[in-house]
């Protein structure tokens, strides 16, 4: 675990450099703060910024020089005591231009503002769409244009939007400030126009400078596009703090919270309780007990459906319902086979850890319904290899039990949060609130893996397919060639299992130290508490 944590810290430091130290120094020479410095200055002193999508773009676009953190810093932070979503373009990465992952990350930030009814602050410093990849950024539903659709929807929802133009704001991006409730600009460095001086010259032959075309004075004194101008970054950020300070409160969801308490058991023991060998059984309850307040857990049906742990607890004072994979082998009582058995007799079945059995799916579905009934946020803890397979499972109705679990989870109206601590494979990812099921936050530990199946299983399957294909072409393959091919396939597949591979594509919001889990979940519930539940809980047509 320590090696994984060291790697996490190294990757974090590297990614936070954005376009590199020279580019950061260039920002300062222009009299500008960097994106991360702007965020740090903006949020309340002694508060922490909960970064979302730090590793977005990691390993992508190498042929274009890379796009660290997607070229934009996003997350949750307190501004004048108000929890806000913050979006800050990083001008050290291709002048803040939009890559495909930049669009995805910006839309994720707006999604968080919409679903949690949180004010959103845009610190704009972007050259617009990255033209070499414009076909992947411009025209589709979840591309650049979706941002302005979301601007309009956020406004209609009554969610406060504040935009500060602190650098370039060009082309379609110029609509963002004026579609926000408050639009500010920094003199000398901020500029906003549909077409810059070069494009204006080539299009209509007009020679005009950036300040005349779209500088602070022009837009505050002539066009009226911008509300107010400020001499530097800090004074502009101070103005944003004053805006938030005077903003009224909104109704809350009313989730239960009491005075927070730390776990009574040592949370650092998680590092040793989670085995390095991911097939080795362990007791997930020991992990849960080191994440929850007072290490106090009220189990739901503890003797039934034991391959899933369900129960009530508190995290940083917030009441939560926890659904987690049990990773140890459990001895379960099941219905005895018909014929010769006494009425009511039960048989014993050994159930493998990390596998969802029919009885566990049935239990979890009912538990999720109870949490919706009682307005308790749900926390899913994944270390899952999938659902049980085989004739016994099929005859027992594993498909309908799994469908019941998915229906209850997918239709939940209480906020959901997902923590991937180990494996997250196949349908198990779906059933325990993977990204497709709208968790408010989805975080991964460095020990996480996400894929359709494990690397070993996938490699063997892919090997069989490739060997059969070669033989169909009349080619022969020696045992040595087969082993080399297996190793190549395994290496390729294992690279895709990494939590950083998932984080680079925003399949998870963050890769975190396990000790940061409570902070992420608590802040996530605090955010969700700003959005009252207005939709009735209805699971629809559910199989029984």
Regions found by a protein language model. Give the residues of each.
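Ligand-binding clefts of soluble mixed alpha/beta catalytic domains
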Residues: 1-544
């Amino acid at each position: 675990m320590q090696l994984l944590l060291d790697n996490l810290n190294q990757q974090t430091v590297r990614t936070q450099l954005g376009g590199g130290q020279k580019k950061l120094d260039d920002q300062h020479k222009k009299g500008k703060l960097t994106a991360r410095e702007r965020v740090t200055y903006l949020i309340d002193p002694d508060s922490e910024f909960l970064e979302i999508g730090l590793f977005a773009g990691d390993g992508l676009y190498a042929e274009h020089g890379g796009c660290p953190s997607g070229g934009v810093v996003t997350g949750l932070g307190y501004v004048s005591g108000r929890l806000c979503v913050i979006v800050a373009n990083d001008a050290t990465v291709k002048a803040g231009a939009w890559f495909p992952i930049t669009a995805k990350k910006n839309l994720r930030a707006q999604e968080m503002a919409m679903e949690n009814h949180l004010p959103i602050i845009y610190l704009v410093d972007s050259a617009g769409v990255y033209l070499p990849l414009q076909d992947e950024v411009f025209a589709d539903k979840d591309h650049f244009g979706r941002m302005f659709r979301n601007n309009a929807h956020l406004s209609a929802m009554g969610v406060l939007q504040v935009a500060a133009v602190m650098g370039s704001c060009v082309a379609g991006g110029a609509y963002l400030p004026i579609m926000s409730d408050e639009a500010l600009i920094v003199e000398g460095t901020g500029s906003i126009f549909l077409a810059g001086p070069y494009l204006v010259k080539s299009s209509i032959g007009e020679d005009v400078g950036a300040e005349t075309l779209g500088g602070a004075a022009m837009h505050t004194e002539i066009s009226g596009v911008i509300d107010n101008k400020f001499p530097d970054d800090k004074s502009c950020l101070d103005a944003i703090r004053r805006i938030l300070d005077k903003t009224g409160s909104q109704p809350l969801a009313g989730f239960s919270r009491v005075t927070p308490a730390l776990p009574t058991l040592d949370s650092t023991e998680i590092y040793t309780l989670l085995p390095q060998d991911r097939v080795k059984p362990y007791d997930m309850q020991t992990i849960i007990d080191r994440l929850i307040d007072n290490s106090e857990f009220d189990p739901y049906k503890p003797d039934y459906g034991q391959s899933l742990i369900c129960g009530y607890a508190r995290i940083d004072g917030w009441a939560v319902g926890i659904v987690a994979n049990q990773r140890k082998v459990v001895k379960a009582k099941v219905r005895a086979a018909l014929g010769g058995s006494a009425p009511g007799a039960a048989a014993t079945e050994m159930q493998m850890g990390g596998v969802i059995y029919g009885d566990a799916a049935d239990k979890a579905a009912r538990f999720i319904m109870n949490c919706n009934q009682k307005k308790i946020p749900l926390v899913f803890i994944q270390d899952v290899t999938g659902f049980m397979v085989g004739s016994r499972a099929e005859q027992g109705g594993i498909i309908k039990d799994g469908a019941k679990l998915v229906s209850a989870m997918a239709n939940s109206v209480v906020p959901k949060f997902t923590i991937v601590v180990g494996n997250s494979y196949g349908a198990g990812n779906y059933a325990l609130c993977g990204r497709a099921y709208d968790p408010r936050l989805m975080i991964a530990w460095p020990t996480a893996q996400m894929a359709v199946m494990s690397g070993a299983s996938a490699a063997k399957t892919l090997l069989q397919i490739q060997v059969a294909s070669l033989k169909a072409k009349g080619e022969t393959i020696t045992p040595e060639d087969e082993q080399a091919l297996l190793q190549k396939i395994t290496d390729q597949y294992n690279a895709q299992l990494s939590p950083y591979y998932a984080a680079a594509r925003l399949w998870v919001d963050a890769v975190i130290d396990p000790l940061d889990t409570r902070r992420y979940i608590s802040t996530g519930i605090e955010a969700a508490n700003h959005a009252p539940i207005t939709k009735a809980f209805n699971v629809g047509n559910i199989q029984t």
